[in-house]
Amino acid sequence: AQSPWYMENNALDFTMEVPGQIMKCIWNFWDYMGDEEFLRTRAWPILKDLAIFYEAFARRGWDGKQFNLEPTVETESYGVSYQLKYTRNCTGTIAMFRWVLQRACEAAEYLGEDQDLIPGWKEVAENLPPYPKFKVGSGEVVGANEMAFPRFTRGDHFMFTGYFLVNQSDEINLDSPQELKDMM
């Protein structure tokens, strides 16, 4: 049986991390092959356009510091919900926005191109919201979004949300502090 949280809609239109996931595959080709021509002519134009879009999509919050990402829908959980309650600052979106913006800065600096775009990308990447965390019996865990307490019911993909920081953005790895690894 399918989880009642899934429904026929255009929810995937708001899964903003998916373009970043695709970009990561392209970046990994460059990263492993080191083909500068590939970076300059193929990867960079896509990465640059995606970073420009991500910077424009992020909205500065009322505090004047944090950039919020809404509407966003987690790919593994919480489709479009009533009054869009579960569509703000999703973990996968935060992870991939930060990853894309950081790689765009790195590539622009390496290639010596579009230096004027770097400050805006850095500002957004450094001021994205913290990952939503929730206390559970075993400690703190990363949740799908800031309004959605993790659900551990049949049909839900709860286990993937915390792993986004490992398998999508590489923010948590073997060299990370133990307290970060414990949240996965």
Predicted stretch roles:
Residues A11, T15-E36, T41-W44, T91-M184:
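Active-site core of glycosidic bond-cleaving carbohydrate-active enzymes
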Residues A1:
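Carboxylate/His-rich catalytic cores and anion/metal-binding grooves
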